[in-house]
């Protein structure tokens, strides 16, 4: 039984609550009215705790911060059971969540982040996990001491930060304790004196929680997103260098996969830990694209397993990124026919990668002697590193990972732009020990020796902001947040939840088939008019086309303008008021809410890599209508979890949309099947197993010759965890990888 020690004192406005609230019904639940709020106020919290009353009770303090000031405070005291740490932990957990939920509901706010004291986390190890998964709060842990500390710099300059990094102490470093005469304190009995018989100045629990809230706020940047953190030598310090604790409980990861996958991961991770193998990933961008999303999730999981892994990115260069994007489009066959890789662009590209590479091969760098033991290099931006590594450390195994489609039918056409780009890249890639491709036919040029070729799909994380289940309270916050950029750009708004919507989540890229999405929607609306004339137009679903871009993607604005021009032209402008086209700020939860609250998902790419966005949609129970391109057919079971169409066959897409929207039984059947038939291979844990396997095999000194095999098949065999009958996996159809 908890005892309120100090209650929240601020009062919410009933007038504002009334003005922001509305009661609506949805097409799925027409007879149930749901109260929603137009917007929720972003807030932050600080949480601290300590044992009191001779360790018989535990006091919890929560400070509320609005981004400028600490606005409120509450504390509660709960009894503790001596020796029962599990029960005590769960009781503390429940009280913290209850205090925050209560304040959220009463004040119409959404907590985005919470500073957690290390002392509290030690008593309640899974508190951060629960805050993240249950309340969508980013927990950031700080070692806030129960006594006052002072600056390590001289008092007269302690508020100045020198231009030299060595002159100031980074957050989390040890700072000296402030001591005073024992006689100056009212009740010094619980404090320990130092050698000079002086005592530290105590910091009360409310001061500790307030400090945690203020420190937490420092880690949030524009659009209230956690700041990206880049460390020395451009190492991506995932989760603010470990201060952000999203998933502390490995059991949460275990529950996302089957026993075979999990057992394999644990066996491989154990061997790498014992051998102290160091793994290094090198890719072009730390945020925004699919590769960056996978790497953040992978590093987070492997760090939780205590595997020694690091991820590095180069200094960004807009000039080089334009070149790499052109190369990407050329290799996929979606660039203008006259676009070429010039010698000037090659020279700038080579100089850029050499400059960055020399930082990593210099003494103490990840590629210098004593650095990483296995190197993984992502995509066509980084292969220039390979010859440099081979020169400095010829013994280090290098794995090249290709995430994109390489038109094997075009790269061997003499004089073609594709041949030109591929020859330039292959000159470096051929020095790698292994070439990993998506398991899609004709994705690999014939230059790549079959014995070096291995297959691995893309992945997504079921526990990150992009895919985790959002509480309805948090979901409505993000739907409300979506209205802000729509209003700012004078874009039409979604009328959700009163109306359903169809969604395609993808970058604004020439290969994503967005014109086909618009045309398919137009034809679908015409079908509703002709085949279901009794259905009111207000019951017709809207269309949402959205996505956010990568740092190295300069095409987005060009494609966005083309789509807006198309939507407002004949014949599509008739439905333009129901088409929402938005580039979103970089918020994973925002994309999550857009997908989770949709009715049907589309993915009408004309050229594609693997496109794991399809599995993300299926995981939420959304039937997906997509084109037979890239790795998409591997993820959808036609007629069971969605429909596969030929690129450009917009009449077929419209027909499938009509069937799914008007036949509730069909929709429910497909939705249930989609939700329960997603392979472990496309999740972080299954994907991590592949990287762990490669690191283990190379650490044993073995020369891997996969001969076009799936890495997941090799690792399951190696670890003695073969696939069992009925276990969901991507179809192992016969592939013609090199056309």
UniProtKB/Swiss-Prot annotation:
EC number: 2.4.1.231
Keyword Protein biosynthesis recorded: no
Catalytic activity: alpha,alpha-trehalose + phosphate = alpha-D-glucose + alpha-D-glucose 1-phosphate
Gene Ontology MF terms in the entry: alpha,alpha-trehalose phosphorylase (configuration-retaining) activity
Keyword vocabulary terms for this entry: Carbohydrate metabolism, Glucose metabolism, Glycosyltransferase, Transferase
InterPro entries xrefs: Glyco_trans_1, Trehalose_Metab_GTase, TreT_GT1
Propeptide boundaries: 1-26
UniProt signal peptide: none
Top enzyme category: transferase
Region (Disordered): 1-28
Gene3D superfamilies: Glycogen Phosphorylase B
Listed GO biological process terms: glucose 6-phosphate metabolic process; glucose metabolic process; trehalose metabolic process
Subunit structure of this chain's protein: Homodimer.
Similarity section: Belongs to the glycosyltransferase group 1 family. Glycosyltransferase 4 subfamily.
PANTHER family: SYNTHASE (CCG-9), PUTATIVE (AFU_ORTHOLOGUE AFUA_3G12100)-RELATED
Primary role: Reversibly catalyzes the synthesis and degradation of trehalose from glucose and alpha-D-glucose 1-phosphate. The equilibrium lies in the direction of trehalose synthesis.
Record protein name field: Trehalose phosphorylase
Gene name in the database record: TP
């Amino acid at each position: 039984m908890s005892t309120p020690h100090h209650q929240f004192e601020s009062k919410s406005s009933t007038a504002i609550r009334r003005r922001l609230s509305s009661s609506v019904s949805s097409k799925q639940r027409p007879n149930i009215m749901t109260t929603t709020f137009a917007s929720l106020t972003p807030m932050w919290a600080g949480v601290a705790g300590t044992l009191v009353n001779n360790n018989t009770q535990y006091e919890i303090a929560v400070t509320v911060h609005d981004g400028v000031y600490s606005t409120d405070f509450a504390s509660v005291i709960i009894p503790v059971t001596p020796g029962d740490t599990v029960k005590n932990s769960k009781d503390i957990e429940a009280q913290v969540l209850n205090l925050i939920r209560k304040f959220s509901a009463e004040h119409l706010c959404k907590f985005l982040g919470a500073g957690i004291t290390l002392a509290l986390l030690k008593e309640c190890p899974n508190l951060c996990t629960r805050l993240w998964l249950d309340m969508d709060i980013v927990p950031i842990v700080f070692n806030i001491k129960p006594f006052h500390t002072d600056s390590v710099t001289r008092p007269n300059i302690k508020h100045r930060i020198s231009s030299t990094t060595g002159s100031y102490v980074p957050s989390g470093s040890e700072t000296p304790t402030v001591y005073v005469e024992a006689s100056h304190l009212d009740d010094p009995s619980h404090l320990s004196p130092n050698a000079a018989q002086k005592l530290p100045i105590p910091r009360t629990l409310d001061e500790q929680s307030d400090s945690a809230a203020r420190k937490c706020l420092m880690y949030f940047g524009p659009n209230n997103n956690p700041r990206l953190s880049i460390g020395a030598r451009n190492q991506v310090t995932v989760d603010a260098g470990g201060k952000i604790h999203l998933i502390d409980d490995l059991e949460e990861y275990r529950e996302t996969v089957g026993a075979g996958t999990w057992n394999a991961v644990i066996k491989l991770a154990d061997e790498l830990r014992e051998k102290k193998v160091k793994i290094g990933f090198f890719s072009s961008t730390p945020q925004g694209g699919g590769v960056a999303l996978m790497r953040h999730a992978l590093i987070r999981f492997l760090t939780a397993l205590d595997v020694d892994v690091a991820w590095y990115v180069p200094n960004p260069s807009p000039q080089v990124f334009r070149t790499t994007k052109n190369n990407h489009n050329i290799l996929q066959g979606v660039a203008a026919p006259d676009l070429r890789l010039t010698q000037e662009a090659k020279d700038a590209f080579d100089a850029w990668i050499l400059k960055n590479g020399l930082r990593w091969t210099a003494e103490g760098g990840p590629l210098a002697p004593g650095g990483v033991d296995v190197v993984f290099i992502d995509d066509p931006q980084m292969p220039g590193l390979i010859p440099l590594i081979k020169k400095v450390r010829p013994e280090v195994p290098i794995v090249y990972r290709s995430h994109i489609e390489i038109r094997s039918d075009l790269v061997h056409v003499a004089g073609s732009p594709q041949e030109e780009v591929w020859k330039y890249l292959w000159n470096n890639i051929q020095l790698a020990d292994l070439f990993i491709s998506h398991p899609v036919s004709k994705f690999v040029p014939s230059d790549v020796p079959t014995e070096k070729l291995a297959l691995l799909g893309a992945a997504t994380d079921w526990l990150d902001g992009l895919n985790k289940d959002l509480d309805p309270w948090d979901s409505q916050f993000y739907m409300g947040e979506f209205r802000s950029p729509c209003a700012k750009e004078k874009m039409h708004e979604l009328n959700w939840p009163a109306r359903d919507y169809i969604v395609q989540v993808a970058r604004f890229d020439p290969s994503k088939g967005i014109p086909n999405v618009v045309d398919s929607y137009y034809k679908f609306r015409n079908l509703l008019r002709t085949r279901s004339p009794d259905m009111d137009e207000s019951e017709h679903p809207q269309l949402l086309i959205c996505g956010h871009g990568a740092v190295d993607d300069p095409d987005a604005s060009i494609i966005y303008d083309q789509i807006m021009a198309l939507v407002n032209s004949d014949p599509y402008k008739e439905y333009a008021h129901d088409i929402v086209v938005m580039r979103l700020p970089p918020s994973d939860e925002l994309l999550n809410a857009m997908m989770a609250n949709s009715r049907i998902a589309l993915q009408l790419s004309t050229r594609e890599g693997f496109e794991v966005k399809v599995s993300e949609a299926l995981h939420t129970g959304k039937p997906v209508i997509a084109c037979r391109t890239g790795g998409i057919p591997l993820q959808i079971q036609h007629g069971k979890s969605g429909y596969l169409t030929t690129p450009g066959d917009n009449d077929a897409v419209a027909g499938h949309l009509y069937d799914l929207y008007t036949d509730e039984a069909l929709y429910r059947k497909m939705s249930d099947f989609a939700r329960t038939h997603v392979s472990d291979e496309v999740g972080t844990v299954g994907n991590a197993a592949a990287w762990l396997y490669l690191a283990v095999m190379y650490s044993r000194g073995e020369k891997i010759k996969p001969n076009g095999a799936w890495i997941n098949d090799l690792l399951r065999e190696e670890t003695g965890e073969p696939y069992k009958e009925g276990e969901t996996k991507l179809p192992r159809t016969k592939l013609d990888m090199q056309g």
